[in-house]
């Protein structure tokens, strides 16, 4: 039995299948963990959703910003972006089933047996483990059982951009969603920045990657995430595993076997920006 973690799919189904063939993935024994953003911009988002869903308990994924946006468009809150190439999902006979399945996925996964955390974008520098799990649970509970339409309709804002223990209601939920699915850089006072997507070495000096800020949690338990393709040539601290290597931009898809920390990669079959 092996545990594999893979970076953002974003509709790059063929590359995922080639990676799984390389490692001889066996869904009856192995586990596949996905860092979110299963959909958007690649040309096989429908196939990605169906495949991950079909794996059942052999796969665990978290919600990314593109996944949440897909739910938003399914609810009629936002319009479909042509560049996202998700039309096939909306015309699929299992469309509603897929969206319902996606809505029930977590924002944070804690594998206690193998000692790692997985989320799409990261974990707030102001959170300990208990707070991170609580904040994820609060959002997940609304998405699964509450007024998820209202939550998704109100998630498209950048405020609040800093954590306070007394945050409540939509402000608290929005901050959590932004941390788990959108965060890259922070200011030194831990305010979130949502504009810069550059590699750290090219960013304004007032910004620092979230994982370089002081938080004992970052040294206590390994954190696996995606979302930030421009980290592809950046060395991250020990315990920080960045798996998005920009397959959808014509680079490669990366997979990590957790037991021996061996990496596997598959070059993009095409540059999806050109289609």
Swiss-Prot record:
Its EC number is 3.6.1.41. The lineage of its organism: Bacteria, Pseudomonadati, Pseudomonadota, Gammaproteobacteria, Pasteurellales. HAMAP family: ApaH. This is Bis(5'-nucleosyl)-tetraphosphatase, symmetrical. Hydrolyzes diadenosine 5',5'''-P1,P4-tetraphosphate to yield ADP. The keyword Hydrolase applies. Belongs to the Ap4A hydrolase family. It comes from Pasteurella multocida (strain Pm70). It comes from the Bacteria. It catalyses: P(1),P(4)-bis(5'-adenosyl) tetraphosphate + H2O = 2 ADP + 2 H(+). One of its GO terms (molecular function) is bis(5'-nucleosyl)-tetraphosphatase (symmetrical) activity. Signal peptide: none annotated. Keywords: Hydrolase.
